């Protein structure tokens, strides 16, 4: 496992300073991997996966605007899928990356689907972590209930307890040490040394604005059937149903898919079955260098 990485900042078209953590390839040849996080999450969720993958390829783990070390947007109406996708393309262009494999968790998975539809020649494959063209309203309501709305905590122990309370139903079996690590990935210390969620609370406005609410994405899925895809579903997921995955397979017979036991929304991508599936997917679709034109 290689943890060597560097900080990379770039500017959005509307002037926000955005952040990406870059794990350089130890050996060249493989396509870069772009990791895109879930709604309230950030690049730190991909540390283990990036360290696993960068033996053979560069790995970019992005903080979406309003998360992590990326700037908060003064206009919360920009916290929506088209803006995030535009930022992702800008990141790739700023690094002169012509072709990439996208690994997206939840919101990041939807970003990967949109990117594949927009420029399929640049997307060699997409790994969809517990999201697809149909979103279960039950899971969406649960996420809307906590996104940007968590009560304050006063210590890292309380942050870990809050993380367990919020996500424990999706991640049974994690130890207290695991939950503390999970908290450190989703919280940061404010000026007073108190842990706070590492996200702009105004991202939750996307759930109350009809123009930014998730749409029927089956037509989008139909557009990208030619793009290789791997779907990772948590067996306990309340966002991506088994029925949705079954329909995805019916409509795209070469769709690769696995179900991860004892995981809901979302698998952590450090599970052995996830790593094995991603490794196999990259061996098939991610083995050509793609920097420059």
Language model features with spans:
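Catalytic histidine-centered segment of alpha/beta-hydrolase-like enzymes
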Residues: 263-272
């Amino acid at each position: 496992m290689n943890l060597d990485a560097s900080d990379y900042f770039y500017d959005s078209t509307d002037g926000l300073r955005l952040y990406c953590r870059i794990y350089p390839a130890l050996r060249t040849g493989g396509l870069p991997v772009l990791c895109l996080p879930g709604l309230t999450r950030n690049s730190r969720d991909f540390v283990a996966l990036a360290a696993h993958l960068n033996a053979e390829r560069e790995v970019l783990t992005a903080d979406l605007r309003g998360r992590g070390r990326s700037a908060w947007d003064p206009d919360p109406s920009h916290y929506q899928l088209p803006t995030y996708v535009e930022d992702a393309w800008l990141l790739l262009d700023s690094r002169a990356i012509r072709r990439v494999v996208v690994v997206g968790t939840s919101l990041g998975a939807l970003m990967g689907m949109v990117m594949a539809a927009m420029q399929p020649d640049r997307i060699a494959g997409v790994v969809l972590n517990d999201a697809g063209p149909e979103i279960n309203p039950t899971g969406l309501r649960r996420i809307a209930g906590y996104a940007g709305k968590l009560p304050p905590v006063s210590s890292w122990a309380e942050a870990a307890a809050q993380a367990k309370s919020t996500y424990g139903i999706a991640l049974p079996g994690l130890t207290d040490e695991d939950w503390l690590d999970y908290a450190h990935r989703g919280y940061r210390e404010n000026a007073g040394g108190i842990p706070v969620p590492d996200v702009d609370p105004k991202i939750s406005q996307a759930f109350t604005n009809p123009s930014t609410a998730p749409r029927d994405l089956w037509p989008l899925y139909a557009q990208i059937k030619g793009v290789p895809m791997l779907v990772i579903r948590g067996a306990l997921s309340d966002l991506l149903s088994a029925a949705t995955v079954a329909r995805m397979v019916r409509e795209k017979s070469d769709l690769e898919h696995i179900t991860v036991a004892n995981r809901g929304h979302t698998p952590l991508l450090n599970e052995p079955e996830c790593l094995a599936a991603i490794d196999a997917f990259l061996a098939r679709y991610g083995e050509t260098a793609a920097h420059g034109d």
